[in-house]
Curated annotation (Swiss-Prot):
Name of the gene: infB
UniProt subcellular location: Cytoplasm
Protein name, as recorded: Translation initiation factor IF-2
Start and end residues of each stretch annotated as G1: 389-396
Species per Swiss-Prot/TrEMBL record: Shewanella baltica (strain OS155 / ATCC BAA-1091)
Ranges of biased composition (kind: Basic and acidic residues): 180-194, 202-228
Amino acid sequence: MADTTVEKLATEVGKSVERLIEQFSQAGIKKGQADNVTEAEKQQLLDYLKKQHGGENAPTKMTLQRKTVSTLSVAGNGGQSKDVKVEVRKTRTFVKRDANEATLKAEEEAKVEAEALAKAKAEAEAAAAVKAKAEADAKAKADAEAKAKAKAAAEVKVVKDMSPEAEAARLEAERLKAAQEAATKRKQDEEAAKAAETARLLAEEHSKRWAEEERQRLEAEKNGDHHITTSKVARAAEDTSDLDEEKRGRRARNKSNAKKRGGKDARDGREKHMRNRSTAPESMAHGFNKPVAAVSRDVRIGETVTVSELAHLMAVKATEIIKQMMKMGSMVTINQVLDQETAQMVAEEMGHKVVLIRENELEHQVLKDRDDEDGIKQESRAPVVTIMGHVDHGKTSLLDYIRRAKVAAGEAGGITQHIGAYHVETENGMITFLDTPGHAAFTAMRARGAKATDIVVLVVAADDGVMPQTIEAIQHAKAGNVPLIVAVNKMDKPEADIDRVKSELSQHGVMSEDWGGDNMFAFVSAKTGEGVDELLEGILLQAEVLELKAVRDGMAAGVVIESQLDKGRGPVATILVQEGTLRQGDIVLCGLEYGKIRAMKDENGRSITEAGPSIPVEILGLSGVPSAGDEATVVRDERKAREVALYRQGKFRDVKLARQQKSKLENMFANMTEGEVKELNIVLKADVQGSLEAITDSLTGLSTDEVKVNIIARGVGALTETDATLAAASNAILVGFNVRADAQARKTIDSESVDLRYYSVIYNLIDEVRAAMTGMLSPEFKQQIIGLAEVRDVFKSPKLGAIAGCMVTEGTIKRSAPIRVLRDNVVIYEGELESLRRFKDDVAEVRNGMECGIGVKNYNDVRVGDQIEVFETVEIARTL
């Protein structure tokens, strides 16, 4: 880029040439009117102008405002003093010089010092030069004197006849001349000595100052006291200075007032001054030292703790715990819930002491505060007998005959859908029966029945023998270590085979007493009543052997057999009392729920006020529907019962969340590799909790890799409008098991066209859901060969190209069907049959053994000996 002259630049910027030259001169650049200006000189001038007008390089300013409020006592009218608030405001501006300015300043100082050194050196050199000149002059003078003496001697020789007066005048002149020369030399020597001394003093002064500055710099670097320039200390020093100044002014005012008022006020002023005396300023050195040893803490860990909470307890970052758990082979997040054992392992691995605490201390105290001391007398109680067996083997019919009541007719399809609890008075004593379902879906309900029972009666049909649920009942009885009595039912049938039943049971470890075993066998008929009395006697005999006893007086405890949500009565729970006496008005803590018993009913629906051990009873008044199998306990304080229930709910939620999180992490790769899976959404409502669990397990078990049953909502009670809305939004099937939809729900179902299904037998529900899943399966297609033709000759057609003259060897050849051309039994082309003729006539199909002409669409390379294979795609129905 060409350089610009000063005159041209002045025209561009709109200034006079003289003003621009002046600004160049101020910026340190000497220019004339016709001189060229480079880009670097332009930038230098621009930087100078910016600095002059407060631009980028202008010094940075910071203004601090300080406001101090103090109180001044002023004498008022009547000799009373009053306090006056005095506010002092100060503004200070600090200027921060930029690096360029500091550099320039340092350069100027260095330049001044260099000039001083040069000046001292020049003076020393001048003094040395003066001295050398004086010495040279003295030497020249001596030489001149020697020459003069020699000349004088010669003159004496020549002029011997000179008069004495002339000689005296000559000597006087020589003496004056010598004195003058000596004075001049002495003056020169004094000046040279003075200059040398001045140079020496100046050099000593500069060397001392330089040495002192170097010593201060080294000392500052050694101490490293960089805090002196920090704003915090500067503000503290400024505040201290302001306070000192204010106190000096206040002291002066107090002294003047004390002189005016007298002794007491003066003393008060001195005391006040002593109280207000400021403390010594704190040290600027920090007081924190890095710990050199590992810190071991006592970490108190509850039953569950999150990663962030554990990090807070150990005073470390959560990332440290996550790293430690990754080293231990576990992937966690900061909000993940850890169980007590895992948290203990992590804390001990990181060097801390662990103190395990029980968060359920309140629960322990509430359950301990009961009237069940060891000194209370225990009395004999009735045995709790659970009737088990395969479906349709006659369990409910047998119980029906014993109770003399028609229970089986009330069950849908004659199949027991949930546990029935009944107590029966016999001539020899009372027996409580639990009738469990025999269907495969009710495994959990049978397990609960075996857990709460004393004796298991295994019903086996004499004509059917041992079945899958029979084997399962045997396993439940053995797992619960419960005595087993076998009731061989349907003895009135001619197909009854006792030996077969005994033989099959013996294969599963159930040996009759006749065969040397320990199990009692009773051969009964629920239809005729044959052997029922012997069965009851055997049950009571077994109960006597067990010596069943329980506390009758005191606070009751039991187990939830069944629970449901009744529309009119609210949550209803069937409880089997195991000890104590349950009374109306008691406070019951039942699993995650609690409440005060508002009403009690027996198995026949009659209201009762109390129930003793081994008595099943329905209670009303709980806060929610408890889960079947929960322990029910009577407590004293409803408020504490509520606290325990809320604690249990929170704990249940934490455990569930931890389990879900673990499942998510473990199934991460499985979920990633899963393809597109179709889902059958279901909203399920049932009459009782046990049936709901059984149906849920059965439907979930139907899921396959292609179709998944997704129960998006389930509950106990009637179908409500909320259920219908959820089903409509989720495109789900609404299923009711022994429940119906209310009026509002029916309106929503009709308006949203929701698929609603009612069931009363679990068989039908499972079969229809399986059929629906089968319809959701992706169709499977299969290629089926319908005909095969052999090429005997090839003709050329102007319209269709190559025409193959063929003989149909197998099946039927159809027009417009997909074909394959085979050569040496290898597929070389796959396409469509375009033309099919027989004797110049277009035909739809040609059967086996006939000749025809075949035109293959978009293919002309047909040769003699090729085979043309005709096939069709057939859809195959799939099943689960």
